[in-house]
């Protein structure tokens, strides 16, 4: 799938469906929406990303949208590919907590070693904090989760946290889960 992503192969659609639980129709609608803002077919620029998300998240300021853009631009090329776009939507829509946490882990395990190291964990926490601030949470509410995550990493000989450890630790922290899963009021606007 190139940056323009004008067509998805059936394998691409199946992969997206298996990772996100979106239906084939939803994937098609997401692609249509993506293409409607991807004017130059090179992936979403920051301005295109802002135009899509600012309609759906009216209370987000430019700094929050920029931060989301930087986080979801996983290859750091200044463009949001369709794969990155689907990831962004999946994270901010109402999906099962364990699926969302699994996806978060996969998205932030950039070196694909099966562990979140300190920097990768920090990036997840930044996402949660940025999201929560945009929704009116007190930033200090994430402190206990962050501390627990970092403490468990320090106790592990591998210097990181596995997907299973992350899901277990994150899913029992109501504050962290709410910070990432608060988009229920946006259900009708998102997928």
Curated annotation (Swiss-Prot):
Q: Which GO terms describe its molecular function?
A: calcium ion binding
Q: Where is the lipid attached (N-myristoyl glycine)?
A: 2
One Gene Ontology term of the biological-process aspect is: regulation of signal transduction
Enumerate the spans annotated as EF-hand domain. 25-59, 60-95, 96-131
Pfam families registered for this protein in UniProt? EF-hand_7, EF-hand_8
Gene3D superfamilies the record matches: EF-hand
Task: Give me the residues that bind Ca(2+), please.
Answer: 73, 75, 77, 79, 84
Q: Which CDD domains does its entry note?
A: EFh
What are the alphabetically sorted keywords of the record? Calcium, Lipoprotein, Metal-binding, Myristate, Repeat
For this chain, the family text in UniProt reads: Belongs to the recoverin family.
Checking PANTHER family in the record gives: CALCIUM BINDING PROTEINS, CALCIUM-BINDING PROTEIN L
The molecule here is called Calcium-binding protein L
Query: Source species, please?
Result: Dictyostelium discoideum
Q: Corresponding gene?
A: cbpL
